[in-house]
Design a protein with these regions (language model features):
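Active-site loops and adjacent core secondary-structure elements that bind or stabilize anionic groups
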Residues: 1-199, 214-232
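Gly-rich Lys/Arg/Thr-decorated short loops/hinges at beta-loop-alpha junctions or inter-strand turns
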Residues: 23-35, 109-115, 189-208, 285-307, ...
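Alpha-helix N-cap/helix-initiation motif
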Residues: 36, 40, 214, 247, ...
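Conserved helix-loop functional segments at active or binding sites
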Residues: 53, 227, 264-268, 353, ...
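Flexible, glycine/charged-enriched surface loops at secondary-structure junctions
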Residues: 57-65, 164-167, 230-237, 267-278, ...
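Active-site-proximal loop/turn and secondary-structure-junction residues that shape catalytic pockets
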Residues: 70, 125, 237-240, 342, ...
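Glycine- and Gly-Pro-enriched alpha-helical subdomains that act as flexible
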Residues: 72-112, 242-341
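C-terminal binding/interaction regions
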Residues: 117, 121-122, 135-165, 170-172, ...
Length: 392
């Protein structure tokens, strides 16, 4: 297949639309089910690069959950403990494969943003992973292959119209890429930068210790940022992104957004949330929305008389600000990556509130000294990578 016609481009009025490589070359994909759209393929091809690089950098199966050309979550296949399995809604599935754990983590980090995601998997999709995907609201998946039973499970989604794409894992794009805006062609070399432990060698803080587990988290955050719309900041812990602040025009707003998402991820692990008793038959999306409201400032939207009875079997107590603060103080050893330098120490102050202890950023600000001093204030370890990771 040398080209694939699409229903339309970004919007229904943008016709005609198609994908192709040029020079009469074959596309490196097969569409096994469904009719993926323009934005689906943008998500798929960005996501595939992300998980391919995560697998190369860590040696572990990887997954990402994409929405509107930025990842909502990304992770490698570390095992889930009982609490993680519960908050990711996979505790009823028994033992999970490493790839299934990776997708459960990627989808579970920010379930509100991942609703209707496009999934990318680094490895052949197995049955355990397909079972998780089947019951989530998702637009499609791209992987280097599918086990026969897994493919049959996925084909049952959306009445047989679920988008399933298989990509040639050996495909290598041309070293020069092009983009057209307003009839004008932009050309640049592909971002072939290898993100690995060597980038974390230049530690500029008094605390010089970055353990191996934190290095993996920093690598995950940086690779995630490489395929996130800029400006962007990523919080990571235990082999996964836990908060991604994408597409903001100021660095501090990236950090605040990513930090608030990381806080929500940790609040969902609190006894207050784990003890919620939902009514029988409530949908997964309704459950996610209710939790999001319950842990936020608008908690009365789910606790008002006449409303909570439709959601919970037993009316929950209010999760007070004091209780949330006390719980969040237990969040530690979080890693943070930034796609460009921090211009002010306020980013570090905000990061500290969400348990950040390890940071990787390019460096190069005229106020680097202030940023380093703020890290030293909290005994953080920060590496200057010397590389920027803008993505547009």
């Amino acid at each position: 297949m040398k080209e694939l016609e699409l229903k339309y481009g970004c919007n229904p009025n943008q016709k005609p639309s198609k994908i192709y490589i040029g020079e009469n070359k074959e596309l490196p994909i097969q569409v096994l089910s469904g009719k993926p759209g323009y934005i689906n393929f943008l998500d798929a091809f960005n996501g595939w690069q992300l998980v391919k690089e995560l697998k190369k950098a860590t040696g572990l199966p990887a997954a990402t959950s994409f929405k509107h050309v930025s990842p909502a979550g990304a992770a490698v296949g570390l095992p889930l403990d009982k609490t993680m399995a519960q908050i990711y809604w996979v505790d009823d599935l028994g033992e999970l494969s490493p790839l299934a754990c990776a997708y459960a983590r990627a989808r579970g980090a920010d379930r509100m943003s991942s609703f209707g995601d496009f999934i990318a998997l680094s490895d052949v999709c197995d049955v355990a992973t397909a079972k998780i995907i089947k019951r989530e609201v998702s637009d499609g998946v791209i992987a280097p292959g599918y086990e026969p039973e897994a493919l049959e499970i996925l084909k049952q989604k959306k009445k047989g119209n679920y988008n399933i794409v298989q990509i040639d894992p050996l495909y290598m794009p041309a070293p020069i890429e092009h983009k057209e805006v307003y009839g004008i062609t932009f050309e640049q070399g592909r971002n072939e930068l290898d993100i690995n432990r060597e980038l974390l060698a230049h530690v500029v803080t008094e605390n010089q210790e970055i353990p191996d587990s934190a290095k993996i988290d920093l690598i995950i955050s940086l690779i995630t940022l490489k395929y996130t719309q800029s400006n962007s900041v990523c919080f990571a812990k235990d082999g996964q992104a836990i908060g991604i602040g994408a597409g903001q025009q100021s660095r501090i707003h990236c950090t605040r957004l990513a930090g608030s998402k990381a806080d929500n991820w940790f609040l969902r692990q609190s006894p207050n949330v784990l003890g919620l008793q939902f009514v029988d038959g409530i949908g997964r999306a309704d459950r996610d929305n209710s939790i999001d409201l319950y842990i936020g400032e608008d908690y009365m939207d789910v606790l008002e008389e006449g409303i909570w009875q439709n959601i919970f079997k037993v009316k929950p107590d209010i999760f007070t600000m004091e209780e949330k603060k006390e719980w969040l103080e237990q969040m530690t050893d979080v890693a943070l990556g930034s796609d460009a330098f921090f211009p002010f120490g306020d980013n570090i102050e905000r990061a500290h509130k969400s348990g950040v202890k390890y940071i990787a950023q390019p460096g190069g600000s005229v106020r680097d000294d202030n940023v380093i001093d703020t890290c030293n204030k909290y005994h953080m370890a920060m590496a200057f990578t010397g590389i920027r990771l803008f993505h547009h």
